[in-house]
């Protein structure tokens, strides 16, 4: 049986196993600007919060899961989303209705 949106929202935390060492049952909001790296030339996947961060990455995965998609993308504003759509998704000759 397919899960409804309410059930998906309720159980996403459990499915991702995102509990931490402090007993939290929900994913934390990371408010840091920069991230440490294990060594020179090695990255944890996050460099600078304006480009990417664990909180936005988790929210995007959860939105994709709730909507039944394979991926989701977060932008800082509606205008940024429109820009991304026009310059990265659309091809020459496509039409946009706004």
Name each region found by the language model:
Residues 1-29:
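Short conserved active-site loop signatures built around small residues
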Residues 9, 18-19, 56, 90-92:
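Generic recognition of cysteine residues
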Residues 21-24, 64-66, 88-89:
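Solvent-exposed alpha-helices and their adjacent loops that cap or buttress functional pockets
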Residues 28-29, 71-73, 94-95:
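Structural motif
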Residues 34-83:
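Conserved N-terminal alpha-helix of the aminotransferase class I/II PLP-enzyme fold
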Residues 88-98:
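Conserved PLP-anchoring active-site segment centered on the Schiff-base-forming lysine
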């Amino acid at each position: 049986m397919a899960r409804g949106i309410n059930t998906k929202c309720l159980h996403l935390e459990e499915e991702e196993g995102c509990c931490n060492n402090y007993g939290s049952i929900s994913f934390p909001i990371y408010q840091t600007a920069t991230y440490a790296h294990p060594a020179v030339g090695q990255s944890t996947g996050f460099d600078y919060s304006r480009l990417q961060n664990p909180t936005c990455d988790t929210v995007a995965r959860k939105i994709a899961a709730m909507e039944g998609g394979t991926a989701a993308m977060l932008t800082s504003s509606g205008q940024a989303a429109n820009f991304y759509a026009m310059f990265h998704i659309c091809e020459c000759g496509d039409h946009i209705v706004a």
